Amino acid sequence: MIVFIYIVLVFLILRFSVTVFNFLSNPKLGHYGKKFDDKVSIIISPSSVDATELIQSISCQDYKNVEVLMVGSNEELSTTAANAKGRYLLFVDSCSVIKMGLLNSLIYRAKVFNLKLVVLIPNRSLNSFQDYLLEPIPDFVLLNLLPLRLVRLLNLPWSAAAWERHVFYDAESYKRRNADSEEGEKDEKKAETLLANGMILSNKRTSVNEASKQLLSTFDRNPLTIAVYLLFLIAGPLVLILNSQLAFISLPFGLIFLTRIMISFLTKQNPLINVILHPLQMVALTGLLISGTLKKLFTSGIHSKS
């Protein structure tokens, strides 16, 4: 048992270290003063939310050399992108709003660091209790596990499927990616993942099913990885509480408290609410991952039998 407790503490300290690294390195899209005139094609993914507010925010941009393409309800995203004429492609969800300076900042970042792909993590509009319960969870998991700055610095390939609603591509790179070419695989390493820093606001109301799918994508839908993560995330602290003295328990609680504060400031969320709701969010995280994994395994079993 003592070995398991030490492993749990090491896992907790490693996650805390990643959060501290993200907090100090501040992986946000900066507001740059440079101006560009390269054509940008903004491709709007369909959803249940009307895109009027998004289109209005695009028209208010200081960047005018843009074309706006709407993906049809029965149309593939790649089909719409193939008709785009821009040098850069910005994929956004229809329930989003973009702020002034976004396009110039993205192009500056892509040119200076020779990036072919920029994954953006939007700020979230939280209104209902369900929003406060579910929406912060993906941000917590990502910023607690992945040092975002190292994605570019070490050319780390990682699955960005969970964040594919807000992506900025070099157009030629996107074509090579869809062609499954060798150059397309190399372009995947010329990528960066950044917090949108208030320049993209997502108003999407995430359902339980959608939240589960996003979390599964974060772990690349690997049941073993999910099981190990939940073992140390949930079972670990419970074992500590049941088998340790109060002075020993204060360490993990202090690290969790500081972790939630730092991630809340990074994502511009309310730190007090996230700290208070942390136990409920962890219960929700466990339920979402377990239900999503079981559903995936059950569905895979049905398909394999048929």
Give the residues covered by each predicted segment.
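Membrane-embedded multi-pass helical conduit in multi-pass membrane proteins
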Residues: K34, L231-G301
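Long helical/loop segments within the catalytic core of UDP-sugar-dependent glycosyltransferases
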Residues: A81-N83, L106-Y169, S173-K175, N274-Q281, ...
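Glycine-rich, basic loop-to-helix element that forms the pyrophosphate-binding segment
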Residues: G72-A84, M100, N104-S105
